[in-house]
A protein has these predicted regions:
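Non-catalytic structural scaffold of enzyme domains
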Residues: 1-119
């Protein structure tokens, strides 16, 4: 079953975080038609969804298996960087650059910082 979740990535990007009523209501409505139909696993098709994996599991049912492709994406990125000879310079120091497809406003940057780094 393919299920379009048109609003979900945007909700995550706009700080509708785990366990909020808005997120729970959206997921409940989205997943209700598929509960108790014999579906045993859900494959997350977006890198955003890993942040709400537990919410999806709770909305669908505790027994469902959840698979995400994030580890595979990271492994592939690492492989490509190694193939191209691209590595972090030893004198680069600490820090991060966040590139995204939405907005560069301060609210979004704070949201990403909270999602990725917990602060």
């Amino acid at each position: 079953v393919n299920l379009a979740c048109n609003k979900l990535a945007g909700m995550i990007e706009h700080n509708v975080l785990s366990h909020s009523n808005e997120l729970q209501d959206y997921l409940a409505g989205l997943l209700a038609p598929y509960k108790n139909t014999g579906i045993q696993a859900i494959v997350l098709g977006c890198t955003h969804y890993v942040f709400i994996k537990e919410d999806i599991k709770e909305a669908f049912g505790e027994d469902v298996l959840i698979f995400d492709g994030n580890r595979g994406t990271v492994n592939r990125l690492k492989s490509v960087l190694e193939e191209k000879g691209i590595k972090r310079p030893s004198d680069a120091g600490k820090g991060a650059v966040i590139l995204n497809s939405s907005s560069d406003d301060q609210f979004s940057m704070k949201t990403y910082s909270k999602l990725f780094y917990g602060k």
